[in-house]
Amino acid sequence: MSDAQTHGTVLAFDLGLKRTGVASGELAIGIAHPLTVIQAESTDARMAAIEKLAAEWQPALFVLGLPTRADGSENEMTRVARNFARRLESRFERPVFLIDERLTSATAESELHARGIHGKKNKALTDAVAAQLILQGFFDARLTA
C-alpha cells in the first residue's frame, strides 16, 4: 500500500448472492464499523447500491472478503468474489484488497447472539458485522506489517 493510502475512508464488503454486508472505517484510525446491508440478487443492482455508497463516502479503497473452504482451497464463491473485485476496481478506479473471510459470518452471528440479537434482525445484521470483521482484519494486518 502506498503512502497516499494511509488516510481516507475504506468500504468493505461481505459478498453474498442475496445480501452483501457493508462496513466502513478510516485508514488513519484503523477501526471498522458495520454500515448497512445491500439487498440485491443481481450484480448490477448490487453495483448500483455501491455506487450510491461510494458517492456518499468517497472511499480511498475497498476491501472484499474472499470466501474459501475451511482448508483454504477455492470454491465457486471465491471465483464470484474475484470477479466482483475486478468489477469494483474497474468501475471505481480504486484498489480492492481481498481478505480471507473464513469464519467471519459465524463469528458475527455469535457476537450478535451474545448481545441478545436473534431471528430476522440477527440475519440482517450478521452480514454487516461480518463486513466489519473483514475490515478490522485488514486494519489489524496493516499494523503488524
From Swiss-Prot:
Disulfide bonds: none annotated. SMART domains: YqgFc (SM00732). Signal peptide: none annotated. It comes from Thiobacillus denitrificans (strain ATCC 25259 / T1). It holds the Pfam family RuvX. This is Putative pre-16S rRNA nuclease. GO terms for biological process: rRNA 5'-end processing. Belongs to the YqgF nuclease family. InterPro entries: RNaseH-like_sf (IPR012337), YqgF (IPR005227), YqgF/RNaseH-like_dom (IPR006641), YqgF/RNaseH-like_dom_sf (IPR037027). Its EC number is 3.1.-.-. Keywords: Cytoplasm, Hydrolase, Nuclease, Ribosome biogenesis. Could be a nuclease involved in processing of the 5'-end of pre-16S rRNA. HAMAP family: Nuclease_YqgF. GO terms for cellular component: cytosol. It is an enzyme of class 3 (hydrolase). CDD domains: YqgF. It comes from the Bacteria. It is found in: Cytoplasm. The keyword Nuclease applies. GO terms for molecular function: nuclease activity.
